[in-house]
Amino acid sequence: MAKKLFIETHGCQMNEYDSSRMADLLGEHQALEVTENAAEADVILLNTCSIREKAQEKVFSKLGMWRDLKQQNPDLVIGVGGCVASQEGAAIRERAPYVDVVFGPQTLHRLPEMIDAARSTRKPQVDVSFPEIEKFDRLPEPRVDGPTAFVSVMEGCSKYCSFCVVPYTRGEEVSRPFDDVIAEVIHLAENGVREVTLLGQNVNGFRGQTHDGRLADFAELLRVVAAVDGIERIRYTTSHPLEFSDALIQAHAEVPELVKFIHLPVQSGSDRVLAAMKRNHTVLEYKSRIRKLKAAVPDICISSDFIVGFPGETEKDFEQTMKLVEEVGFDFSFSFIYSARPGTPAADLADDLPEEVKKRRLQILQGRIHQQGYEISRRMVGSTQRILVTDFSKKDPGMLQGRTENNRIVNFRCDNPRLIGQFAQVHIDDALPHSLRGTLIEGTLH
């Protein structure tokens, strides 16, 4: 009977990508088959996130739940990867001594030998080093599962924002070779992928070396990816305002495969707070980039990240954030109350803002952005939208779903699985709080 692999993933899309590559790697080297049931697994991997304190505590809570499985099956291998593993290293075993393997985001390619060593020696294996881009040279070609796929183009971040652990857990920025990225996209397209999402902690900071030794920037990469036969849509995340260049904006104007949606984190609308965060840009500079982007693509939708209650944030600072929210018209956000991360400069700042004030501000911010997003969705009612059909609806197996150019989920009545992977025109009938409902226009599939 085939041995089983269970992977649980916390955090960002980069972690989702890494988890898929772990499955590819262990499927090829150890013939492990992915299962959705941890209780039947021979190997359990937890791919972790350390961006917030609650996310980190969630790791040890989950490991505690798996301790009984280890007691029942001493041959079970439990591994912890991702950013908590990178940050904590061998210290993870002080709280969870039954963990066999600890690996970082840059060492996941060493999983087969680490698992083998843990089994043969009965000793824990820990490797959270930063061997730069080596992991991409050691990973098998990605498996295709549906019409969409993630492609990692660079790793790490060199911005060192005062609140962020990423440079310490994923290392400095390292771009994959340009030709390697294109080769992966071609492989995906040849196997039925029609939409790719290019990933990086600072994806628009990509500087990939070409076969002739030249460095190509992210705007050039987008244009070449768009030229790959079969690729009809391109998304990317996450961007940094500092490197949202005029060349990138021009690509949005000229490359039809780029969707009309961008995620561009700003964190705060206060220059004073941005300086304390070491974001190295002002609100005015951010607004200038948004103005140019909207001039290039008038109907583009923009989402962002916000941290509420950063140490020293005043009511005036928060009001400036709300002003920016309304001026830009963000329609979605990842927004959280500030959580001090050990080892970051911001962790040394006095955090004396009452918790109830932070919660109130977060509620106001999220409420306003949700309202703006819903208003955009309502304006889409009556329109016809081109969507890529990706799967059955999660709530109704009699419906299919896909995404619009501006990142709205659309559900429509149809139970024919052969539509999955095709583009279709859908008439939008109704706007719900988190999705749209529509009717398939017959004869529009392609």
From Swiss-Prot:
> Ranges for the TRAM domain?
378-442
Instruction: Show the GO cellular component annotation of the record.
Output: cytosol
Keyword flag Iron-sulfur? yes
Write down the required cofactor(s): [4Fe-4S] cluster
Per the record, the domain of life is Bacteria
Show the catalytic activity.
Answer: N(6)-dimethylallyladenosine(37) in tRNA + (sulfur carrier)-SH + AH2 + 2 S-adenosyl-L-methionine = 2-methylsulfanyl-N(6)-dimethylallyladenosine(37) in tRNA + (sulfur carrier)-H + 5'-deoxyadenosine + L-methionine + A + S-adenosyl-L-homocysteine + 2 H(+)
One Pfam family cited in the UniProt record for this chain: UPF0004
How does the cofactor bind to this protein, according to its record?
Binds 2 [4Fe-4S] clusters. One cluster is coordinated with 3 cysteines and an exchangeable S-adenosyl-L-methionine.
Annotated ranges, domain MTTase N-terminal: 3-120
| Domain Radical SAM core: start-end pairs | 143-375
Q: Where's it found, cell-wise?
A: Cytoplasm
**The EC number(s) this enzyme carries:** 2.8.4.3
Molecular function terms in GO for this entry? Answer: 4 iron, 4 sulfur cluster binding; metal ion binding; N6-isopentenyladenosine methylthiotransferase activity
Return the protein name. Answer: tRNA-2-methylthio-N(6)-dimethylallyladenosine synthase
Q: Which organism is this entry from?
A: Pseudomonas paraeruginosa (strain DSM 24068 / PA7) (Pseudomonas aeruginosa (strain PA7))
